[in-house]
Structures are given as structure tokens and as C-alpha cells.
């Protein structure tokens, strides 16, 4: 008994993410199945292993998402220097067209997250490059019709009720973002390709360096060359292409990608329709989640005192978005860990990783919620000097705290769903919970019962809570041995280019 415990402890001291095949894949599984160790000893040792994996993956992922949001924020700041009209146009372009494109492309890119993660865990390294290329092809094709939305942005905005002068200026900004569509189409498959191999730190360095370049180029565009709003949006697109090219160079020269990138392959053109179906399910799952909070703001604009409601909700949504960045990092970590362990044939490790990641994210979100409630009367003064808005934010703080706690669990479970390949199922759950339950209840409470923003938010919290409970139950009842079998069968079918979805 003592020798097995000593071996388990010694295993913890080995380099975690650069181990040999057997060490990296079966270390935690061997600990969890070691009957010579007591139950609590197994949990303790496995937790140490998982925490190392978790924070190695989550911390850089959080940093990357924060930096990428920082680029959009800098663009809006420089647009504000051009004038209030330009700021409104840039905000409209970013929150409308850019966020729609970002959500769609990021969602479709998560399909490669499932396949690359499971293939890497199963040591089918040659297929990772094929999945990367296949996803890129699908996303580039998807980007072509989206380009038409950007080209005809002016009449589209006018038809949606925007003033003609705002629509005209916004369309100029949107034109400069067209290259960004295809930067997204290449970037997100690359990002998931690297994450599935636990290669996350290089992307963080690249994003940080690009943020500095973006700042310099934006300043030159506005103050040195006078290129105006179009110049700012072109710089934003260029910054994303810098990220893409830097990651491509890294893949080409890094020894860590030699097994997974063999160059371009004609296999990438096989099974594109089935790959598109999986990508579309992933996109629907993510878009339904990201659009949900936007609908809360839209409904608030229909209230009797929309200005106060929108101001207070904007502050709450900004705080929620900052907190959500942490959850997104754990979402990425959960997806990678679960898909890797399923691909490697480790059902207990996949289940344990799910429990640890969810628990850590929940505890962090609970701490954030307590801080929000403690500072609810003063936190709004970071954004505004208005006492009326501060009071409204204080009234909404309990709803914000509940949302933050739910966001500590729900994105992690969505990451587990991506790791398992459940995107289509979660998309149906999202439709039912968010759009059939949450929004109608919020509308009735907010308008029929005159509860205002609190009523709308109560209904939408109800939808999120229902979705979270369903995902918790589904995850808790998961037969992880069967998920390992499904992962193996999925990889066999994709490698043979037979339909993935006919399982």
C-alpha cells in the first residue's frame, strides 16, 4: 500500500503537460482506480493533478479573451475621439455586426474543439491537422454570405429603424470589418486546435503583443494619418489577421505541433457537409446563449422609463461580462480536459475533471457574487455619477449576483457538452429554457405585472436556472464508459470519412 501511494505522489511531481503518452493519459485514471489507496487519498491526489491541468488551461484562456475584448474597447475609445456620431457608429458596428459574426464563428469553431480534443486524447495526432483544415474551409464558406450583410449594412440598419445619418456612418465602419470575418474563420479553428493540445500560453503572448500593436496603429490611424472611422475598423481587422498569422507561424515552427500538423491534406475536403452540420449545431448552441442577454437589454428599452433601466442594466451587464470572462476560461478548460480524457479512454478522469472544474468555477463565482452584494451601493460609481442610476443598480444587484453564480456553472457544463459532442442536444435545451420559458416569463413579469427590469431579469434567470438544472442532471447521469465508446466510434467514423451524425 505504501509503495503505491509513494508512486502516486511521485507522479504528481513530473511535468504535467509534457509527459510521455502513458504518463499524461493515465496518471489520474490510475490514481482514481487504485484500490490500495483510501477513497479520500485518491480524491486528494487526483484533485492535485486536475488543478494543475485546470489552471494551466484556464488562466491563459481568460487572458486571451480579456485581451481580445480590449481590442474592441480601444477601437471604441479612439472612435470617441472622432466624435459622438463616430462613437455611436463604432458601438453599433461592434455590438451588432461584429458580435453576431464573433458568436457565429466562435460557435462553429467549437465543433473542431470536440474532434481535435478527442483525437489528441486518442493519439490520432495526424487527424488534428485535417480537422483544423476542414473547420477552416467550412467557416470560410460560411463567411461568404455574411459578407453580403456587411456590404448592405446601411439599408439593413435603416430597415431596423436606425436614423439614416447613423446608418450611413456605421456602414463605413462595417465595411472595414469585412476582412475580420475571414480572420475569425481562420483564427477560431486554430485556437481550438492549439487548446486541444493544451497549448495556450503562446496564444496569450501573441494576443498581448497584438494589443500593443493595435494601440499604436489605432493612434496613427486617427491622429497621424487622419483615416477616420474606416481606418479604425481596418486596423481592427488587421490586428486580428496579425493574431492569425502569428499562430500559423507558431504551428509551422513549434516542435509541439510536429505530430499534429503535417501540412495541407486533401482529406480536409472529405465529409464537409457532416462537419458543417456539427458546426451549425455548435453555433446554434453558443449563439442562443450569447443573444439571450442582449434580448434583456432590448426588452428594457421598451419600459416606461427606458433611460434609467438601460443605464442600470448596462452597468450590470458590464460587470457580468467581466465576471463571465473567468467562466469562459473554465469553459475552454472543461472542453479540453473532457475531450482529451474521453479520447484517451479514461471515463473516471473525464467525470472527475467535470466535477472539479465545475466546483472551482462555482466557488469563484460565489465569491464574486458576495463581493457584488457587499459593494452594491457603491459599485455603480465606477461607471456613473448619477445617484438615481446607483440606486437602480443596487436594486438589481441581487439579480446580478444570482446571474453570476449561474454563470459560474452553466458555461462549464456547456464546455463539458462540447467535449462530449452534445452540441445539438444543448441547442434544443437552450431553445426551450431561454426562448420558450425565460423570455416569455420575463416579458409577462416586466410588462403585465409592471415589475420593470427586475421582472424581465427574473424571468430570464428562471430560464438560465432551468437550463443549468437540466445540464447538471444530464451530466450527473452520464454513463462515462459509453461516452468513451462514442468518442472512439466518432473518431473512427470521421477518419473513415463516413457520416458522423448517423450514430
UniProtKB/Swiss-Prot annotation:
Subcellular location: Membrane
Gene Ontology CC: membrane
A Pfam match: MatE
Membrane-protein topology: Multi-pass membrane protein
GO molecular function, one term: antiporter activity
Keywords of this entry: Membrane, Transmembrane, Transmembrane helix, Transport
Leader peptide range in chain numbering: none
Matches recorded under InterPro entries: MATE_euk, MATE_fam
PANTHER family: MULTIDRUG RESISTANCE PROTEIN
NCBIfam families referenced in this protein's UniProt entry, alphabetically: matE (TIGR00797)
CDD domains to which the protein is assigned, alphabetical: MATE_eukaryotic (cd13132)
Transmembrane segments: 54-74, 87-107, 137-157, 166-186, 203-223, 225-245, 271-293, 313-333, 355-375, 399-419, 427-447, 456-476
Protein name, UniProt field: Protein DETOXIFICATION 36
